[in-house]
Regions:
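Conserved glycine-rich cofactor-binding loop
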Residues: 12-13
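Substrate-binding pocket helix/loop in short-chain dehydrogenase/reductase
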Residues: 96-98, 104-109
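Active-site helix of classical SDR
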Residues: 120, 156
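Conserved glycine-rich Rossmann-like NAD(P)H-binding loop of the short-chain dehydrogenase/reductase
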Residues: 26-43
């Protein structure tokens, strides 16, 4: 029997890279998608050597307007059947909304929201025909509340949580597993790239990428629509649902600021 195939976006580093190792250990063939071809090729060789799985790499920037369609066309042309889609690619930016570059904020929306939605819509019908596989979307605990000074990023992750929950409900009984992994602060390059490394949020305790990836995979396998990584993050996610919104905004604003 041929192994199932998992496509992982944003696979070259961070949570995506760790998820690639998790799926490879479970015997999945992989399609790894990210911008940096050399890094992908190095990772593919490592996964093939360590886990004996087939790995295909596709260097593409999903922040580009037509990237999802081009990726889908390449998959069809190559005859690759995707059983599990892991939408992990994304980025954030810290700063006042009116001061951050408009083009980069629109790219963030496209990558975090539009590309994720497009790939899910393009790949889902064939999964439904086979009645197996599923989708694992990587969201964030940022999606549970508004985020002053990371306003667009928090909003995109709110979309991911809402979209995934609705999709999981629609596909109940289909044989597909649909989950949203919601990590909190994690030890990746995300904070540095977002300009948030010195914020109070990322000065607090962070989880390791391997732990987050393991929790995400196990939660998806268990059929949980929402997988909050870590007990502390789970309690935070619960708390913001019952605390006054004005208080939550003040706390998040403080966490997203840099210490004096």
């Amino acid at each position: 029997m041929s192994p199932l195939t998992a496509l992982i976006t944003g696979a070259s580093s961070g949570i995506g890279r760790s998820l690639a190792h998790v799926f490879a250990r479970e015997g999945y063939a992989l399609v790894l998608v990210a911008r940096r071809l050399a890094v992908l090729e190095e990772l593919a060789a490592e996964l093939s050597r360590d886990h004996g799985v087939t790995v295909r790499v596709m260097a593409i920037d999903l922040a580009e307007p037509d990237a999802a369609m081009r990726l889908f066309a390449d998959l069809q042309q190559s005859g690759v059947v995707v059983d599990v889609l892991v939408n992990n690619a994304g980025f954030g930016m810290q700063g006042a909304f009116a001061a951050l570059p408009a083009d980069r904020q629109l790219q963030m929306i496209h990558l975090n929201v539009t590309a994720l939605t497009a790939l899910t819509r393009l790949l889902l019908p064939s999964m439904l025909e086979r009645g197996k596989g599923g989708v694992l979307n990587v969201g964030s605990t940022a999606g549970f509340q508004p985020g002053p000074f990371m306003a667009v990023y928090y909003a995109t992750k709110a979309y991911v949580i809402s979209f995934t929950e609705a999709l999981a409900d629609e596909l109940s009984g289909s044989g597909l597993r649909v989950s949203c992994l919601a990590p909190g602060p994690t030890a990746t390059a995300f904070a540095t790239e977002a300009g948030a490394a010195e914020s109070r949020l990322f000065q607090s305790d962070t989880m390791s990428v391997d732990e987050v990836a393991r929790i995400g995979y196990e939660g998806w396998r268990a059929g949980k629509f929402l997988v909050v990584a870590g007990r502390r993050n789970w309690w935070r996610a619960f708390a913001v649902r019952i605390l006054p919104r004005s208080y939550v905004r003040r706390v998040v604003r403080d966490l997203n600021s840099r210490p004096d």
